[in-house]
Structure formats: structure tokens, C-alpha cells
């Protein structure tokens, strides 16, 4: 039979747990967006904060903890089902045994977004900015040869997201990775074209713009 003292201690524990849950900072506050924020607003807010607090760029002692907090908030709010559950139950939706994830190590296991690879691919922090990063970047956009043509993309002369450095990085990445190559039907404005002749080939250097991306390639045809 429970004693009055044990009941009192149990009640205190419940009260403390409740206060901790209520005191937890809202995921919306962490990202600095309103509860009515759109998916795009959440994505842009996360991008901005992730750039600011990524441990490779921010050397302050609490940067890593802040970055993980931001990542956890984004993981929840960027998923429609998790966001709906969070809006209904708050943090308790993920701290209880029945939640989709617990705290600490559970979060580490469920959050699989590789930020290091993302930022290194763009050479944002000045590391692997030359050969290694360039090869990985170009591999993302390696295109298949057109049937019967000797056209090859030799290098990317310029890459720009527009609207400020990496302003809409995540949105642009989604667009870029949604196609496997620059087919002729998708080519738009030809910016420049330089022709030159070899002993057996007629070649031209073509610079094209597709949306916010500019690519340069050499088109050679035998004579």
C-alpha cells in the first residue's frame, strides 16, 4: 500500500516532468518560424541556421549542440506526419516510449541526413574545394552520350544558384537531382559559341544556361 510520502514524491516527479516538457523550446522557435510556416519557409530557415551553426564553420563550444537542436527541429517539421503529431502532442509525442523516436541516441539513429557530404560537395567551408570536391560535384551531373553523337561535357565553367550565395540551396538541389542529363529537349538559351577546326574534326565550344545553371561543353563531329 502506498504511503502518503511515496504518493507525494510521485506527484512531485510527475510535476517536474510536466514542467520540463512545457519548458522545452518549440521546434518552431528553434527555427525562428511561425507555426503556420510553409514547407519552403521551414526549409529556408533550416538552411540559414545550419550554415551558421555547422561545427565545421562555427567553432564556438555550443555550436554542435545548437546544430543538432536545429537538425532535430527540421527533421520533425519537414515531415508532414511528424509535424502533425508534434502540433497535436508537442514534445511528448517523441519523448514517450510509444513515440516515433526518443531522446538522445534514438534521434541519432533516426536522423540520416549527411550534412558533411552536403556541404563538402559544395566546398562551402574551404575544404576539398579543388579536385576531390569538383569530381564529386561533376559526378552528380554526369550525362549520358546522345545516340550517335560524340558530344561530351568536359567541365562546368560556372555554377550559380542566383538570389545570393546558396539562398535556395535545398530547393535548387531538388530540381537539379530530378533529371539525369541535359537532353536536347531541355536545353534553353545558348550564351556563346566558339568554333575551331582540327585536322579531322570540326569542333565548337558551347555555353548554355538552364535555369540558374550554366554549363560549357565541346561538341565535335568528324568530317
Swiss-Prot record:
<keyword id="KW-0597">Phosphoprotein</keyword>
<dbReference type="Pfam" id="PF00226">
    <property type="entry name" value="DnaJ"/>
</dbReference>
<feature type="modified residue" description="Phosphoserine">
    <location>
        <position position="133"/>
    </location>
</feature>
<keyword id="KW-0732">Signal</keyword>
<dbReference type="GO" id="GO:0006986">
    <property type="term" value="P:response to unfolded protein"/>
</dbReference>
<dbReference type="InterPro" id="IPR051948">
    <property type="entry name" value="Hsp70_co-chaperone_J-domain"/>
</dbReference>
<dbReference type="GO" id="GO:1903895">
    <property type="term" value="P:negative regulation of IRE1-mediated unfolded protein response"/>
</dbReference>
<comment type="subunit">
    <text>Interacts with HSPA5/BiP; interaction is direct. Interacts with ERN1/IRE1 (via the luminal region). Interacts with DERL1.</text>
</comment>
<dbReference type="GO" id="GO:0005783">
    <property type="term" value="C:endoplasmic reticulum"/>
</dbReference>
<dbReference type="InterPro" id="IPR018253">
    <property type="entry name" value="DnaJ_domain_CS"/>
</dbReference>
<dbReference type="GO" id="GO:0002639">
    <property type="term" value="P:positive regulation of immunoglobulin production"/>
</dbReference>
<feature type="domain" description="J">
    <location>
        <begin position="26"/>
        <end position="90"/>
    </location>
</feature>
<feature type="region of interest" description="Divergent targeting domain">
    <location>
        <begin position="91"/>
        <end position="223"/>
    </location>
</feature>
<dbReference type="GO" id="GO:0005789">
    <property type="term" value="C:endoplasmic reticulum membrane"/>
</dbReference>
<dbReference type="GO" id="GO:0034976">
    <property type="term" value="P:response to endoplasmic reticulum stress"/>
</dbReference>
<dbReference type="GO" id="GO:0070062">
    <property type="term" value="C:extracellular exosome"/>
</dbReference>
<dbReference type="InterPro" id="IPR036869">
    <property type="entry name" value="J_dom_sf"/>
</dbReference>
<dbReference type="GO" id="GO:0030544">
    <property type="term" value="F:Hsp70 protein binding"/>
</dbReference>
<dbReference type="GO" id="GO:0005788">
    <property type="term" value="C:endoplasmic reticulum lumen"/>
</dbReference>
<comment type="function">
    <text>Co-chaperone for Hsp70 protein HSPA5/BiP that acts as a key repressor of the ERN1/IRE1-mediated unfolded protein response (UPR). J domain-containing co-chaperones stimulate the ATPase activity of Hsp70 proteins and are required for efficient substrate recognition by Hsp70 proteins. In the unstressed endoplasmic reticulum, interacts with the luminal region of ERN1/IRE1 and selectively recruits HSPA5/BiP: HSPA5/BiP disrupts the dimerization of the active ERN1/IRE1 luminal region, thereby inactivating ERN1/IRE1.</text>
</comment>
<dbReference type="GO" id="GO:0036503">
    <property type="term" value="P:ERAD pathway"/>
</dbReference>
<dbReference type="GO" id="GO:0005730">
    <property type="term" value="C:nucleolus"/>
</dbReference>
<dbReference type="GO" id="GO:0051787">
    <property type="term" value="F:misfolded protein binding"/>
</dbReference>
<dbReference type="GO" id="GO:0051087">
    <property type="term" value="F:protein-folding chaperone binding"/>
</dbReference>
<keyword id="KW-0256">Endoplasmic reticulum</keyword>
<keyword id="KW-0834">Unfolded protein response</keyword>
<feature type="signal peptide">
    <location>
        <begin position="1"/>
        <end position="23"/>
    </location>
</feature>
<protein>
    <recommendedName>
        <fullName>DnaJ homolog subfamily B member 9</fullName>
    </recommendedName>
</protein>
<dbReference type="GO" id="GO:0005737">
    <property type="term" value="C:cytoplasm"/>
</dbReference>
<dbReference type="InterPro" id="IPR001623">
    <property type="entry name" value="DnaJ_domain"/>
</dbReference>
<dbReference type="GO" id="GO:0030183">
    <property type="term" value="P:B cell differentiation"/>
</dbReference>
<keyword id="KW-0143">Chaperone</keyword>
Amino acid at each position: 500500500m502506498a504511503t502518503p510520502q511515496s504518493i507525494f514524491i510521485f506527484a512531485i516527479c510527475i510535476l517536474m516532468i510536466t514542467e520540463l516538457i512545457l519548458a522545452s523550446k518549440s521546434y518552431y522557435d528553434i527555427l525562428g518560424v511561425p507555426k503556420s510556416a510553409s514547407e519552403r519557409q521551414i526549409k529556408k530557415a533550416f538552411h540559414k541556421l545550419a550554415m551558421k551553426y555547422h561545427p565545421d564553420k562555427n567553432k564556438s563550444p555550443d555550436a554542435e549542440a545548437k546544430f543538432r537542436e536545429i537538425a532535430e527541429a527540421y527533421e520533425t517539421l519537414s515531415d508532414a506526419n511528424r509535424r502533425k503529431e508534434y502540433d497535436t502532442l508537442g514534445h511528448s509525442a517523441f519523448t514517450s516510449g510509444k513515440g516515433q523516436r526518443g531522446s538522445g541516441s534514438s534521434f541519432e539513429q533516426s536522423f540520416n541526413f549527411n550534412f558533411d557530404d552536403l556541404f563538402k560537395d559544395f566546398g562551402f567551408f574551404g575544404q576539398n574545394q579543388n579536385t576531390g570536391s569538383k569530381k564529386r560535384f561533376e559526378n552528380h551531373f554526369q550525362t549520358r552520350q546522345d545516340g550517335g553523337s560524340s558530344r561530351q561535357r568536359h567541365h562546368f565553367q560556372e555554377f550559380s544558384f542566383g538570389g545570393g550565395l546558396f539562398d535556395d540551396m535545398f530547393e535548387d538541389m531538388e530540381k537539379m537531382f530530378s533529371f539525369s542529363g541535359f537532353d536536347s529537349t531541355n536545353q534553353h538559351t545558348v550564351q556563346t559559341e566558339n568554333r575551331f577546326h582540327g585536322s579531322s574534326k570540326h569542333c565548337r565550344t558551347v555555353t548554355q544556361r538552364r535555369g540558374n545553371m550554366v554549363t560549357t561543353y565541346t561538341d565535335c563531329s568528324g568530317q
